[in-house]
């Protein structure tokens, strides 16, 4: 049975922080949005990969976790009644007369005047270590992200890797876990020097262990890990006890169907102009980590700025005969009414 076509003003692809803030900025100029995301919840990488990891560079928030930021954004956009389509990936994007039609892999069909791509780096999957039978342990005692740190309280945790994620989670989980062992193939790290310094201080104090080597084999039953075999730099092997293993070898980013939509691309990113954040296709915008332009910084706050400018241009497509008068939320009674504060 064919699903009925949904009609709206704007389609936002991606429900990460930048996509969520786009709902807010579009709402201020009377543009209603439907949001599509391949994940099962809002937040993007913030909630999927580091929901409890602290973020320090959001203006006005000294410290906030990925989950907290997502919750605040979801609360902020409530007045605009955005509709979400989770667990769906956009498969096709077609141009119509005066707009676009998007079809997802769940056969949802949405038509809108503008499309906003806020899909981060595209779809992402953690890089899986090439270990025999690792899939038997995944989701039970091998994890690529931390949803709730409390679930690791009192556990013997082995963290594998030498980048920022490995070091950050070593530091964040140290007060929670029974023991933390950081394993890396060499003594040099690809992480922030301050994090490396803090980690080495914990090693010196005996609060965590650091070992050199690579995991070659997993040991356990019914998906529950109890130890791993490690091959050291000298070729000798040893067993490392572990109830939980967390490998951080980076992410594999895939642009996915976006690459087939006829947009100009540059190194798997979407070039935009910095006045409107419009792509090479009129009416299609790209904001956040998926876009590129001279001086681009991949920061959440940069994406917020891009969303604000995008909304001003999107208004011209949704309301071509209506001039947009710029207003401030602090002084505009009409904007305050939309936000439900007046």
Say what each PLM segment does:
Residues 1-9, 71:
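Extreme N-terminal leader/targeting segments of oxidoreductases
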Residues 6, 77-104, 109-112, 174-274, ...:
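A Rossmann-like FAD-binding core segment of flavoenzymes
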Residues 167-169, 290-336:
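A conserved FAD-binding loop/helix module that cradles the flavin
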Residues 27-49, 179-191:
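Glycine-rich FAD pyrophosphate-binding loop
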Residues 8-35, 169-174:
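N-terminal Rossmann-like FAD-binding beta1-loop-alpha1 element of flavoenzymes
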Residues 40-64, 192-198:
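Conserved N-terminal glycine-rich FAD pyrophosphate-binding loop of Rossmann-like flavoproteins
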């Amino acid at each position: 049975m064919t699903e009925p076509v949904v009609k709206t003003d704007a389609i936002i692809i991606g429900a990460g922080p930048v996509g969520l803030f786009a709902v807010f900025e579009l709402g201020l100029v009377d543009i209603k949005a439907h949001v599509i995301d391949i994940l099962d919840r809002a937040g993007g990488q913030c909630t999927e990969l580091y929901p409890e990891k602290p973020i320090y560079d959001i203006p006005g928030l000294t410290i906030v976790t990925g989950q907290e930021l997502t919750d605040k954004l979801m609360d902020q956009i409530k007045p605009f009644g955005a509709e979400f389509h989770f667990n769906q990936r956009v498969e096709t994007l077609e141009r119509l007369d005066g707009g676009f039609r998007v079809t997802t892999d769940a056969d949802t069909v949405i038509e809108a005047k503008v499309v906003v791509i806020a899909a981060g780096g595209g779809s992402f999957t953690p890089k899986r270590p090439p270990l025999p039978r690792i899939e038997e342990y995944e989701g039970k005692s091998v994890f690529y992200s931390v949803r709730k740190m409390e679930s690791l309280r009192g556990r013997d945790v082995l963290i594998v890797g030498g980048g920022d994620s490995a070091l950050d989670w070593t530091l964040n989980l140290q007060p929670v876990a029974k023991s933390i062992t950081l394993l890396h193939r060499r003594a040099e790290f690809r992480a922030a020097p301050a994090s490396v310094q803090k980690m080495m201080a914990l090693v010196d104090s005996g609060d965590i262990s650091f070992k050199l080597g690579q995991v070659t084999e997993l040991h356990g039953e019914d998906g529950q890990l109890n130890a791993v075999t490690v091959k050291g730099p000298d070729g000798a092997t040893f067993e490392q006890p572990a109830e939980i293993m967390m490998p951080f070898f980076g992410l594999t980013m895939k642009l996915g169907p976006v690459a087939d939509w006829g947009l100009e691309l540059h190194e798997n990113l979407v070039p935009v102009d910095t006045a409107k954040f419009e792509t090479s296709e009129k009416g299609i915008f790209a904001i956040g980590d998926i876009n590129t332009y001279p001086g681009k910084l991949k920061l959440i706050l940069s994406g917020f700025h891009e969303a604000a400018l995008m909304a001003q241009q999107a208004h011209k497509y949704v309301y071509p005969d209506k001039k947009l008068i710029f207003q401030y939320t602090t002084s505009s009674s009409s904007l305050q009414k939309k936000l439900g504060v007046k």
